[in-house]
Amino acid sequence: MAALILLPAFPTPASADVPPESVRLLAKAAADECFAGVGVDYPAGPPCAVGQPKVNQSYVWGLAQAGRRLWFGTGANVLCLKPKGYQVREPILNDDYVCEFNLSQPARNNPAWPATLGDHRAPEVYTYDLATERLTERTADITSASPADANLLNTTAGLRSAAAHQGVVLLAGPSVLGGVNVFAFDGITGRYLGSTNLSAYENIRHWVVAGGVLYAGVGVGINGGEAGKVLRWTGDRTTPFTFTEVADLPTQVADLTEHQGRLYVSTWPKAVVEGSVAPSPVSTVAAAPGDGGTPLAPPAEDVNDLASIWRSPLLAVGTPGLNPEDAGNWTQVWSAAEYEPDPVVRRAYALGGLASFGGQLYWGTMHVPLQATALHVSVYPPRSQAQLQATVQNTQRAFAVFRGQNLGGSHERIETLYGESTLPAFDPTANNGVGAWAPASTGVTPVYGGSGFGDPFNLYAWKMAVAGGRLYIGTMDFAYISLEGQMPTPPAGATTTPPTFGSDLWAFDAPGRPARAVDTGGFGNPLNQGVRTMIVDGSTLYVGMANPMNLRTDPTPGVPQGGWELIRVSRR
Protein backbone atom coordinates (compact mmCIF):
# COMPACT_ATOMS: atom_id res chain seq x y z
CA MET A 1 0.00 0.00 0.00
CA ALA A 2 1.04 3.58 -0.46
CA ALA A 3 -0.06 6.95 0.72
CA LEU A 4 -0.80 9.81 -1.61
CA ILE A 5 1.28 12.68 -0.36
CA LEU A 6 0.96 15.99 -2.13
CA LEU A 7 3.47 18.46 -0.82
CA PRO A 8 4.60 21.86 -1.98
CA ALA A 9 7.91 22.17 -3.70
CA PHE A 10 10.85 21.55 -1.40
CA PRO A 11 12.55 24.70 -0.18
CA THR A 12 15.44 25.68 -2.39
CA PRO A 13 18.76 25.18 -0.57
CA ALA A 14 20.48 28.38 0.43
CA SER A 15 22.67 29.30 -2.51
CA ALA A 16 23.85 32.35 -4.36
CA ASP A 17 22.47 30.80 -7.54
CA VAL A 18 18.89 29.58 -7.51
CA PRO A 19 18.71 26.42 -9.65
CA PRO A 20 16.33 26.54 -12.60
CA GLU A 21 14.48 23.46 -11.36
CA SER A 22 11.74 23.08 -8.77
CA VAL A 23 11.13 19.78 -7.00
CA ARG A 24 7.85 18.31 -5.73
CA LEU A 25 7.11 15.07 -3.94
CA LEU A 26 4.07 13.48 -5.61
CA ALA A 27 3.61 10.22 -3.71
CA LYS A 28 5.28 8.20 -0.99
CA ALA A 29 5.20 4.58 0.20
CA ALA A 30 3.30 3.96 3.43
CA ALA A 31 3.83 1.36 6.13
CA ASP A 32 2.41 -2.01 5.11
CA GLU A 33 3.47 -4.37 7.90
CA CYS A 34 4.09 -4.46 11.66
CA PHE A 35 7.45 -5.53 13.05
CA ALA A 36 7.97 -6.80 16.60
CA GLY A 37 11.47 -8.24 16.38
CA VAL A 38 13.64 -10.51 14.25
CA GLY A 39 12.14 -13.96 14.05
CA VAL A 40 8.81 -12.85 15.55
CA ASP A 41 5.57 -13.39 13.65
CA TYR A 42 4.21 -10.13 12.28
CA PRO A 43 1.43 -8.59 14.39
CA ALA A 44 -1.76 -7.43 12.73
CA GLY A 45 -1.80 -4.00 11.14
CA PRO A 46 -0.91 -1.31 10.50
CA PRO A 47 -2.00 0.45 12.55
CA CYS A 48 0.24 -1.52 14.88
CA ALA A 49 -1.07 -2.17 18.39
CA VAL A 50 1.99 -4.37 18.85
CA GLY A 51 5.41 -3.64 17.41
CA GLN A 52 6.22 -0.80 15.05
CA PRO A 53 5.15 0.08 11.50
CA LYS A 54 7.40 -1.16 8.71
CA VAL A 55 7.49 -0.06 5.06
CA ASN A 56 8.63 -2.89 2.79
CA GLN A 57 8.21 -1.24 -0.61
CA SER A 58 11.53 0.54 -1.09
CA TYR A 59 12.00 1.35 -4.81
CA VAL A 60 10.03 2.95 -7.58
CA TRP A 61 11.71 0.53 -9.96
CA GLY A 62 9.92 0.51 -13.31
CA LEU A 63 8.37 3.83 -14.42
CA ALA A 64 6.57 4.72 -17.67
CA GLN A 65 4.10 7.28 -18.98
CA ALA A 66 1.00 6.56 -21.07
CA GLY A 67 -0.95 9.69 -21.90
CA ARG A 68 -1.50 11.67 -18.71
CA ARG A 69 -0.87 8.72 -16.41
CA LEU A 70 2.35 7.51 -14.90
CA TRP A 71 2.61 3.76 -14.36
CA PHE A 72 5.11 2.29 -11.95
CA GLY A 73 6.05 -0.93 -10.24
CA THR A 74 7.85 -1.21 -6.94
CA GLY A 75 10.58 -3.31 -5.39
CA ALA A 76 10.40 -4.43 -1.75
CA ASN A 77 13.32 -4.65 0.68
CA VAL A 78 15.78 -4.51 -2.20
CA LEU A 79 18.71 -3.90 0.17
CA CYS A 80 17.99 -7.28 1.79
CA LEU A 81 17.59 -9.34 -1.39
CA LYS A 82 20.71 -11.18 -2.47
CA PRO A 83 21.53 -12.94 -5.74
CA LYS A 84 21.73 -16.68 -6.07
CA GLY A 85 24.93 -17.99 -4.48
CA TYR A 86 25.38 -15.08 -2.08
CA GLN A 87 26.48 -16.02 1.43
CA VAL A 88 23.89 -14.75 3.91
CA ARG A 89 25.07 -14.55 7.49
CA GLU A 90 23.25 -13.04 10.47
CA PRO A 91 20.13 -10.86 10.28
CA ILE A 92 20.68 -7.11 10.30
CA LEU A 93 18.75 -4.88 12.70
CA ASN A 94 19.31 -1.22 13.45
CA ASP A 95 17.21 1.91 13.87
CA ASP A 96 16.91 2.36 10.10
CA TYR A 97 16.20 -1.06 8.60
CA VAL A 98 15.95 -4.76 9.23
CA CYS A 99 16.92 -7.72 7.04
CA GLU A 100 15.64 -10.92 8.64
CA PHE A 101 16.84 -13.34 5.95
CA ASN A 102 15.97 -16.92 7.00
CA LEU A 103 14.30 -15.74 10.23
CA SER A 104 11.53 -13.84 8.45
CA GLN A 105 8.01 -15.19 8.89
CA PRO A 106 7.70 -16.22 5.21
CA ALA A 107 11.03 -18.06 5.38
CA ARG A 108 10.19 -19.80 8.66
CA ASN A 109 6.83 -20.88 7.26
CA ASN A 110 8.54 -22.29 4.17
CA PRO A 111 11.92 -23.86 5.05
CA ALA A 112 12.63 -24.51 1.36
CA TRP A 113 12.64 -20.75 0.74
CA PRO A 114 16.26 -19.56 0.37
CA ALA A 115 17.57 -17.26 3.09
CA THR A 116 18.69 -14.82 0.40
CA LEU A 117 15.02 -14.15 -0.34
CA GLY A 118 13.69 -14.19 3.20
CA ASP A 119 12.73 -10.51 3.01
CA HIS A 120 11.00 -10.85 -0.36
CA ARG A 121 7.56 -9.28 -0.62
CA ALA A 122 5.42 -9.07 -3.75
CA PRO A 123 5.81 -5.82 -5.70
CA GLU A 124 2.97 -3.36 -6.16
CA VAL A 125 1.64 -1.51 -9.21
CA TYR A 126 0.38 2.08 -9.24
CA THR A 127 -0.85 4.75 -11.59
CA TYR A 128 -0.52 8.45 -10.93
CA ASP A 129 -2.90 10.72 -12.84
CA LEU A 130 -1.07 13.90 -13.78
CA ALA A 131 -4.30 15.82 -14.36
CA THR A 132 -6.08 14.96 -11.11
CA GLU A 133 -2.94 14.28 -9.04
CA ARG A 134 -4.50 11.01 -7.91
CA LEU A 135 -2.53 7.89 -7.00
CA THR A 136 -4.29 4.56 -7.63
CA GLU A 137 -3.00 1.16 -6.65
CA ARG A 138 -3.51 -1.40 -9.43
CA THR A 139 -1.98 -4.46 -7.76
CA ALA A 140 -5.37 -6.11 -7.24
CA ASP A 141 -6.03 -5.92 -10.99
CA ILE A 142 -3.35 -8.58 -11.30
CA THR A 143 -3.93 -10.66 -8.18
CA SER A 144 -7.70 -10.89 -8.74
CA ALA A 145 -7.41 -11.85 -12.41
CA SER A 146 -6.50 -15.48 -11.76
CA PRO A 147 -4.44 -17.62 -9.37
CA ALA A 148 -1.77 -17.89 -12.08
CA ASP A 149 -1.49 -14.12 -12.40
CA ALA A 150 -1.35 -13.72 -8.62
CA ASN A 151 1.36 -16.36 -8.38
CA LEU A 152 3.46 -14.64 -11.03
CA LEU A 153 3.27 -11.34 -9.18
CA ASN A 154 3.98 -12.94 -5.80
CA THR A 155 7.13 -14.55 -7.22
CA THR A 156 8.42 -11.41 -8.94
CA ALA A 157 11.53 -9.97 -7.28
CA GLY A 158 10.43 -6.41 -7.94
CA LEU A 159 9.01 -4.81 -11.08
CA ARG A 160 12.39 -3.63 -12.23
CA SER A 161 11.37 -2.11 -15.55
CA ALA A 162 8.42 -0.53 -17.34
CA ALA A 163 7.52 0.74 -20.80
CA ALA A 164 4.54 2.24 -22.61
CA HIS A 165 4.18 1.90 -26.37
CA GLN A 166 1.34 1.74 -28.90
CA GLY A 167 -1.36 1.64 -26.26
CA VAL A 168 0.25 -1.05 -24.09
CA VAL A 169 1.97 -0.68 -20.71
CA LEU A 170 4.46 -3.41 -19.80
CA LEU A 171 5.93 -3.93 -16.33
CA ALA A 172 8.55 -6.63 -15.87
CA GLY A 173 10.96 -8.06 -13.34
CA PRO A 174 12.98 -11.18 -12.56
CA SER A 175 11.18 -14.15 -11.07
CA VAL A 176 12.51 -15.77 -7.92
CA LEU A 177 11.67 -19.11 -9.57
CA GLY A 178 13.46 -18.36 -12.84
CA GLY A 179 12.74 -16.30 -15.91
CA VAL A 180 11.34 -12.80 -16.27
CA ASN A 181 7.72 -12.06 -15.36
CA VAL A 182 5.90 -9.53 -17.56
CA PHE A 183 2.53 -7.88 -16.87
CA ALA A 184 0.54 -5.90 -19.44
CA PHE A 185 -2.12 -3.21 -19.18
CA ASP A 186 -4.08 -1.26 -21.76
CA GLY A 187 -2.46 2.16 -21.67
CA ILE A 188 -5.68 3.91 -22.72
CA THR A 189 -8.38 2.20 -20.66
CA GLY A 190 -6.15 0.89 -17.86
CA ARG A 191 -7.57 -2.62 -18.27
CA TYR A 192 -5.32 -5.48 -17.19
CA LEU A 193 -4.32 -7.60 -20.22
CA GLY A 194 -2.51 -10.52 -18.61
CA SER A 195 0.93 -11.83 -17.70
CA THR A 196 3.59 -14.27 -18.81
CA ASN A 197 6.95 -15.69 -17.83
CA LEU A 198 9.80 -15.36 -20.32
CA SER A 199 11.75 -18.43 -19.24
CA ALA A 200 14.73 -17.84 -21.55
CA TYR A 201 15.87 -14.75 -19.63
CA GLU A 202 16.72 -14.00 -16.00
CA ASN A 203 16.92 -10.22 -15.63
CA ILE A 204 15.53 -7.05 -17.18
CA ARG A 205 16.27 -3.42 -16.34
CA HIS A 206 15.27 -0.91 -19.01
CA TRP A 207 13.38 -0.34 -22.26
CA VAL A 208 13.74 2.28 -24.99
CA VAL A 209 11.69 3.39 -28.00
CA ALA A 210 13.89 4.06 -31.03
CA GLY A 211 12.62 4.69 -34.53
CA GLY A 212 9.08 3.92 -33.41
CA VAL A 213 10.08 0.47 -32.11
CA LEU A 214 10.21 -0.70 -28.47
CA TYR A 215 13.32 -2.57 -27.30
CA ALA A 216 14.30 -4.14 -23.96
CA GLY A 217 17.65 -5.28 -22.59
CA VAL A 218 17.82 -8.58 -20.71
CA GLY A 219 20.28 -10.95 -19.08
CA VAL A 220 20.62 -14.70 -19.57
CA GLY A 221 21.69 -17.33 -17.04
CA ILE A 222 22.06 -17.14 -13.25
CA ASN A 223 21.17 -13.61 -12.13
CA GLY A 224 21.32 -12.66 -15.80
CA GLY A 225 25.09 -12.87 -15.71
CA GLU A 226 25.96 -15.34 -18.46
CA ALA A 227 25.03 -13.28 -21.54
CA GLY A 228 22.83 -10.47 -22.78
CA LYS A 229 20.10 -9.98 -25.36
CA VAL A 230 18.20 -7.06 -26.79
CA LEU A 231 14.56 -7.87 -27.47
CA ARG A 232 12.33 -6.14 -30.00
CA TRP A 233 8.71 -6.00 -28.92
CA THR A 234 6.42 -7.20 -31.71
CA GLY A 235 3.20 -7.30 -29.73
CA ASP A 236 -0.01 -5.30 -29.46
CA ARG A 237 -2.98 -5.07 -27.11
CA THR A 238 -4.28 -8.43 -28.33
CA THR A 239 -0.96 -10.30 -28.08
CA PRO A 240 1.22 -8.21 -25.76
CA PHE A 241 3.95 -10.77 -25.05
CA THR A 242 5.67 -11.38 -28.39
CA PHE A 243 9.34 -10.51 -28.82
CA THR A 244 12.22 -11.25 -31.16
CA GLU A 245 15.93 -11.23 -30.30
CA VAL A 246 17.94 -8.57 -32.13
CA ALA A 247 21.22 -8.61 -30.17
CA ASP A 248 23.35 -11.46 -28.88
CA LEU A 249 25.89 -10.04 -26.43
CA PRO A 250 28.40 -11.66 -24.05
CA THR A 251 27.12 -9.76 -20.99
CA GLN A 252 23.73 -8.65 -19.69
CA VAL A 253 22.27 -5.36 -20.81
CA ALA A 254 21.85 -2.61 -18.22
CA ASP A 255 20.47 0.40 -20.13
CA LEU A 256 19.75 1.42 -23.73
CA THR A 257 19.53 4.65 -25.71
CA GLU A 258 19.28 5.80 -29.31
CA HIS A 259 22.23 7.82 -30.61
CA GLN A 260 22.79 8.94 -34.19
CA GLY A 261 20.60 6.29 -35.77
CA ARG A 262 21.81 3.34 -33.70
CA LEU A 263 21.07 1.71 -30.38
CA TYR A 264 23.80 1.85 -27.77
CA VAL A 265 23.65 -0.30 -24.65
CA SER A 266 25.58 -0.39 -21.40
CA THR A 267 26.29 -3.77 -19.81
CA TRP A 268 27.17 -5.42 -16.54
CA PRO A 269 30.09 -7.86 -16.34
CA LYS A 270 30.05 -11.56 -15.73
CA ALA A 271 32.26 -11.01 -12.69
CA VAL A 272 29.45 -9.42 -10.69
CA VAL A 273 27.72 -12.79 -10.60
CA GLU A 274 30.93 -14.74 -10.04
CA GLY A 275 31.97 -12.36 -7.27
CA SER A 276 28.70 -12.86 -5.41
CA VAL A 277 29.98 -16.19 -4.13
CA ALA A 278 33.34 -14.81 -3.01
CA PRO A 279 34.23 -14.99 0.70
CA SER A 280 33.17 -12.16 2.94
CA PRO A 281 35.72 -9.36 2.40
CA VAL A 282 35.60 -8.29 6.03
CA SER A 283 36.61 -11.61 7.56
CA THR A 284 38.89 -13.41 5.11
CA VAL A 285 42.59 -13.71 5.81
CA ALA A 286 44.49 -16.54 4.12
CA ALA A 287 47.78 -18.22 4.70
CA ALA A 288 50.40 -17.71 2.03
CA PRO A 289 49.42 -19.84 -0.97
CA GLY A 290 51.98 -22.48 -1.77
CA ASP A 291 55.28 -23.20 -0.02
CA GLY A 292 57.09 -20.44 -1.86
CA GLY A 293 54.40 -17.80 -1.43
CA THR A 294 53.70 -17.69 -5.16
CA PRO A 295 50.71 -15.40 -5.72
CA LEU A 296 47.57 -16.71 -7.29
CA ALA A 297 47.09 -15.81 -10.94
CA PRO A 298 43.93 -13.93 -11.96
CA PRO A 299 41.81 -15.47 -14.69
CA ALA A 300 42.77 -14.56 -18.23
CA GLU A 301 40.92 -11.42 -19.23
CA ASP A 302 38.42 -11.30 -22.05
CA VAL A 303 37.38 -7.68 -22.57
CA ASN A 304 34.07 -8.90 -23.99
CA ASP A 305 33.20 -10.08 -20.47
CA LEU A 306 33.75 -6.65 -18.93
CA ALA A 307 31.26 -3.84 -18.47
CA SER A 308 31.07 -2.31 -21.93
CA ILE A 309 29.30 -0.04 -24.38
CA TRP A 310 27.97 -1.90 -27.43
CA ARG A 311 26.72 -0.34 -30.67
CA SER A 312 24.04 -1.74 -32.96
CA PRO A 313 23.94 -1.65 -36.76
CA LEU A 314 22.16 1.35 -38.24
CA LEU A 315 18.45 1.21 -37.54
CA ALA A 316 17.53 2.43 -41.03
CA VAL A 317 19.56 -0.11 -43.03
CA GLY A 318 17.54 -2.99 -44.49
CA THR A 319 14.22 -3.76 -42.84
CA PRO A 320 13.32 -0.83 -40.53
CA GLY A 321 14.56 -1.17 -36.98
CA LEU A 322 16.66 -4.03 -35.64
CA ASN A 323 15.83 -7.58 -36.69
CA PRO A 324 17.09 -11.10 -35.93
CA GLU A 325 19.73 -10.88 -38.65
CA ASP A 326 21.29 -7.96 -36.73
CA ALA A 327 21.81 -9.98 -33.54
CA GLY A 328 25.43 -10.89 -34.28
CA ASN A 329 26.45 -7.56 -35.79
CA TRP A 330 26.87 -5.40 -32.71
CA THR A 331 30.24 -3.76 -32.00
CA GLN A 332 31.95 -3.22 -28.66
CA VAL A 333 33.14 0.41 -28.62
CA TRP A 334 34.37 0.76 -25.01
CA SER A 335 35.10 -1.40 -21.98
CA ALA A 336 36.24 -0.84 -18.41
CA ALA A 337 39.73 -1.98 -19.45
CA GLU A 338 40.19 1.40 -21.15
CA TYR A 339 40.07 3.19 -17.79
CA GLU A 340 40.58 0.96 -14.73
CA PRO A 341 44.25 -0.11 -14.30
CA ASP A 342 43.68 -2.98 -11.84
CA PRO A 343 42.75 -6.13 -13.81
CA VAL A 344 40.69 -7.61 -10.95
CA VAL A 345 38.86 -4.45 -9.91
CA ARG A 346 37.85 -3.77 -13.50
CA ARG A 347 36.03 -7.11 -13.59
CA ALA A 348 33.64 -5.74 -10.97
CA TYR A 349 32.84 -2.55 -12.87
CA ALA A 350 29.26 -2.24 -14.05
CA LEU A 351 27.74 0.43 -16.25
CA GLY A 352 24.60 2.40 -15.53
CA GLY A 353 22.83 5.19 -17.36
CA LEU A 354 23.71 6.43 -20.84
CA ALA A 355 22.23 9.16 -23.02
CA SER A 356 22.71 11.03 -26.30
CA PHE A 357 23.33 14.74 -25.69
CA GLY A 358 24.75 17.43 -27.94
CA GLY A 359 25.77 14.94 -30.61
CA GLN A 360 27.79 12.84 -28.18
CA LEU A 361 27.13 9.71 -26.12
CA TYR A 362 27.45 9.99 -22.34
CA TRP A 363 27.72 7.05 -19.95
CA GLY A 364 28.69 6.32 -16.36
CA THR A 365 29.94 3.48 -14.21
CA MET A 366 28.42 1.68 -11.23
CA HIS A 367 30.23 0.06 -8.32
CA VAL A 368 28.30 -2.40 -6.17
CA PRO A 369 29.51 -1.85 -2.57
CA LEU A 370 32.40 -4.19 -1.69
CA GLN A 371 31.92 -6.20 -4.90
CA ALA A 372 35.43 -5.44 -6.13
CA THR A 373 36.79 -6.16 -2.65
CA ALA A 374 35.17 -9.59 -2.54
CA LEU A 375 36.43 -10.38 -6.03
CA HIS A 376 39.97 -9.27 -5.18
CA VAL A 377 39.99 -11.30 -1.97
CA SER A 378 38.95 -14.38 -3.94
CA VAL A 379 41.88 -13.94 -6.36
CA TYR A 380 44.53 -12.65 -3.94
CA PRO A 381 43.60 -13.78 -0.41
CA PRO A 382 45.14 -11.32 2.08
CA ARG A 383 47.64 -12.74 4.55
CA SER A 384 47.08 -10.29 7.38
CA GLN A 385 44.47 -7.94 8.70
CA ALA A 386 46.59 -5.04 7.49
CA GLN A 387 46.63 -6.44 3.96
CA LEU A 388 42.89 -7.05 4.14
CA GLN A 389 42.29 -3.45 5.15
CA ALA A 390 44.53 -2.29 2.31
CA THR A 391 42.47 -4.37 -0.12
CA VAL A 392 39.21 -2.92 1.21
CA GLN A 393 40.53 0.62 0.94
CA ASN A 394 42.13 0.32 -2.48
CA THR A 395 39.32 -1.50 -4.27
CA GLN A 396 36.69 1.18 -3.64
CA ARG A 397 35.62 3.32 -6.59
CA ALA A 398 33.15 6.15 -7.07
CA PHE A 399 31.54 6.36 -10.50
CA ALA A 400 33.21 7.91 -13.52
CA VAL A 401 31.41 9.76 -16.32
CA PHE A 402 32.54 9.53 -19.95
CA ARG A 403 31.44 10.90 -23.30
CA GLY A 404 32.36 9.87 -26.80
CA GLN A 405 31.82 10.85 -30.39
CA ASN A 406 32.36 8.92 -33.62
CA LEU A 407 32.50 5.77 -31.51
CA GLY A 408 34.03 2.90 -33.40
CA GLY A 409 35.08 5.20 -36.23
CA SER A 410 38.45 6.43 -37.44
CA HIS A 411 37.93 9.80 -35.71
CA GLU A 412 36.72 8.39 -32.41
CA ARG A 413 37.16 10.62 -29.39
CA ILE A 414 36.40 9.56 -25.80
CA GLU A 415 36.72 11.92 -22.85
CA THR A 416 36.65 11.21 -19.13
CA LEU A 417 34.55 14.05 -17.74
CA TYR A 418 34.64 12.98 -14.10
CA GLY A 419 37.15 10.41 -12.90
CA GLU A 420 40.78 9.98 -11.87
CA SER A 421 44.16 10.23 -13.54
CA THR A 422 45.51 7.52 -11.21
CA LEU A 423 43.88 4.68 -9.29
CA PRO A 424 45.30 2.03 -6.95
CA ALA A 425 46.42 -1.18 -8.65
CA PHE A 426 47.70 -4.36 -7.04
CA ASP A 427 51.08 -5.82 -8.00
CA PRO A 428 51.09 -9.47 -6.87
CA THR A 429 54.83 -9.83 -7.49
CA ALA A 430 55.86 -7.01 -5.12
CA ASN A 431 57.39 -7.73 -1.71
CA ASN A 432 58.63 -11.16 -2.77
CA GLY A 433 55.20 -12.32 -3.78
CA VAL A 434 53.27 -10.82 -0.89
CA GLY A 435 51.98 -8.10 -3.18
CA ALA A 436 51.43 -4.38 -2.76
CA TRP A 437 49.16 -1.57 -3.89
CA ALA A 438 50.50 1.43 -5.76
CA PRO A 439 49.05 4.29 -7.82
CA ALA A 440 48.71 3.45 -11.52
CA SER A 441 47.80 5.67 -14.42
CA THR A 442 44.35 5.45 -15.94
CA GLY A 443 45.72 7.07 -19.08
CA VAL A 444 43.27 9.96 -18.88
CA THR A 445 43.02 13.45 -17.46
CA PRO A 446 39.48 14.23 -16.28
CA VAL A 447 37.99 17.25 -18.00
CA TYR A 448 35.94 18.59 -15.09
CA GLY A 449 36.61 16.81 -11.82
CA GLY A 450 36.92 13.72 -9.68
CA SER A 451 34.90 10.54 -9.52
CA GLY A 452 31.38 10.70 -8.14
CA PHE A 453 31.21 14.44 -8.86
CA GLY A 454 33.81 14.73 -6.11
CA ASP A 455 31.91 12.56 -3.58
CA PRO A 456 33.60 9.21 -2.81
CA PHE A 457 30.27 7.74 -1.68
CA ASN A 458 28.58 8.41 -5.03
CA LEU A 459 28.88 4.85 -6.33
CA TYR A 460 26.33 4.68 -9.17
CA ALA A 461 25.69 6.92 -12.15
CA TRP A 462 22.35 5.14 -12.05
CA LYS A 463 20.23 6.85 -14.68
CA MET A 464 20.58 9.56 -17.33
CA ALA A 465 17.86 11.52 -19.13
CA VAL A 466 17.71 14.57 -21.40
CA ALA A 467 14.92 17.04 -20.62
CA GLY A 468 14.51 20.65 -21.66
CA GLY A 469 17.88 20.70 -23.39
CA ARG A 470 19.75 19.49 -20.30
CA LEU A 471 21.35 16.14 -19.50
CA TYR A 472 20.45 14.93 -16.01
CA ILE A 473 22.37 12.26 -14.11
CA GLY A 474 20.89 10.60 -11.03
CA THR A 475 23.21 8.91 -8.55
CA MET A 476 23.25 6.34 -5.77
CA ASP A 477 24.98 7.68 -2.67
CA PHE A 478 26.07 5.03 -0.17
CA ALA A 479 27.20 7.43 2.56
CA TYR A 480 24.24 6.95 4.92
CA ILE A 481 24.56 3.16 5.02
CA SER A 482 28.35 3.12 4.95
CA LEU A 483 28.67 5.66 7.77
CA GLU A 484 25.68 4.21 9.66
CA GLY A 485 23.90 7.54 9.59
CA GLN A 486 26.65 9.37 11.48
CA MET A 487 28.46 12.08 9.57
CA PRO A 488 32.11 12.20 10.70
CA THR A 489 33.56 15.46 11.95
CA PRO A 490 36.02 16.75 9.34
CA PRO A 491 39.58 17.19 10.63
CA ALA A 492 40.70 20.69 11.49
CA GLY A 493 41.85 22.57 8.44
CA ALA A 494 40.27 20.10 6.01
CA THR A 495 39.83 21.53 2.54
CA THR A 496 37.72 18.74 1.06
CA THR A 497 33.95 18.96 0.97
CA PRO A 498 32.41 16.53 3.48
CA PRO A 499 30.07 13.88 2.09
CA THR A 500 26.33 14.39 2.18
CA PHE A 501 23.57 11.93 2.90
CA GLY A 502 21.10 11.23 0.13
CA SER A 503 21.25 10.75 -3.62
CA ASP A 504 22.31 13.45 -6.06
CA LEU A 505 20.84 14.87 -9.24
CA TRP A 506 23.28 16.72 -11.49
CA ALA A 507 22.73 18.47 -14.81
CA PHE A 508 24.86 19.30 -17.81
CA ASP A 509 23.29 22.53 -19.05
CA ALA A 510 25.35 22.39 -22.26
CA PRO A 511 27.99 20.03 -23.69
CA GLY A 512 30.80 22.52 -23.07
CA ARG A 513 30.04 23.12 -19.39
CA PRO A 514 30.74 21.11 -16.24
CA ALA A 515 27.86 19.44 -14.47
CA ARG A 516 25.80 21.48 -12.01
CA ALA A 517 24.34 20.12 -8.78
CA VAL A 518 20.55 20.25 -8.87
CA ASP A 519 20.26 18.48 -5.51
CA THR A 520 22.73 16.58 -3.32
CA GLY A 521 20.55 15.57 -0.38
CA GLY A 522 17.98 13.07 -1.62
CA PHE A 523 15.47 15.81 -2.51
CA GLY A 524 15.04 16.75 1.12
CA ASN A 525 15.12 13.17 2.46
CA PRO A 526 18.63 11.93 3.35
CA LEU A 527 17.28 8.36 3.45
CA ASN A 528 16.72 8.48 -0.32
CA GLN A 529 19.92 6.74 -1.35
CA GLY A 530 19.34 6.62 -5.09
CA VAL A 531 17.70 8.10 -8.16
CA ARG A 532 16.67 4.71 -9.53
CA THR A 533 14.72 5.74 -12.61
CA MET A 534 13.73 8.84 -14.58
CA ILE A 535 11.36 9.49 -17.46
CA VAL A 536 10.94 12.67 -19.49
CA ASP A 537 7.83 14.67 -20.34
CA GLY A 538 9.02 17.72 -22.28
CA SER A 539 11.21 19.69 -19.88
CA THR A 540 9.87 17.80 -16.85
CA LEU A 541 11.45 14.80 -15.16
CA TYR A 542 9.54 12.20 -13.20
CA VAL A 543 11.90 10.50 -10.80
CA GLY A 544 11.56 7.21 -8.93
CA MET A 545 13.59 7.00 -5.74
CA ALA A 546 15.29 4.12 -3.93
CA ASN A 547 14.90 4.27 -0.15
CA PRO A 548 15.40 0.96 1.70
CA MET A 549 15.05 2.25 5.28
CA ASN A 550 12.10 0.04 6.15
CA LEU A 551 11.93 0.89 9.87
CA ARG A 552 11.96 4.65 9.43
CA THR A 553 8.21 5.23 9.70
CA ASP A 554 7.93 7.98 12.33
CA PRO A 555 5.06 10.19 11.08
CA THR A 556 6.31 13.29 12.91
CA PRO A 557 6.49 16.17 10.41
CA GLY A 558 10.04 16.87 9.32
CA VAL A 559 11.35 13.43 10.28
CA PRO A 560 12.73 11.56 7.21
CA GLN A 561 10.84 8.40 6.35
CA GLY A 562 11.78 5.25 4.48
CA GLY A 563 10.14 3.75 1.42
CA TRP A 564 9.87 4.73 -2.23
CA GLU A 565 9.12 8.25 -3.41
CA LEU A 566 7.80 9.59 -6.71
CA ILE A 567 9.16 13.07 -7.45
CA ARG A 568 8.65 15.68 -10.15
CA VAL A 569 11.52 17.92 -11.24
CA SER A 570 10.32 20.75 -13.45
CA ARG A 571 11.56 24.01 -14.89
CA ARG A 572 10.68 27.12 -12.91
Residue map of PLM features:
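Surface-exposed loop and turn segments in beta-propeller and other repeat-based domains
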Residues: 22-52, 126, 132-154, 196-198, ...
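Beta-strand-rich domains and repeat architectures in extracellular enzymes and scaffolds
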Residues: 41-82, 463
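Repeated scaffold domains used in trafficking and secretory/extracellular systems
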Residues: 59-61, 145-163, 199-211, 248-257, ...
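Short coil/turn segments that connect the beta-strands within blades of beta-propeller domains
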Residues: 68, 166-168, 211-212, 260-261, ...
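Residue-level signature of beta-propeller blades and closely related beta-rich strand-turn architectures
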Residues: 76-78, 168, 175-176, 219-222, ...
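Beta-propeller blade signature
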Residues: 86-133, 180-189, 226-237, 278-321, ...
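Blade-level signature of beta-propeller repeat domains, shared across WD40, Kelch, NHL, RCC1
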Residues: 465, 472, 530-572
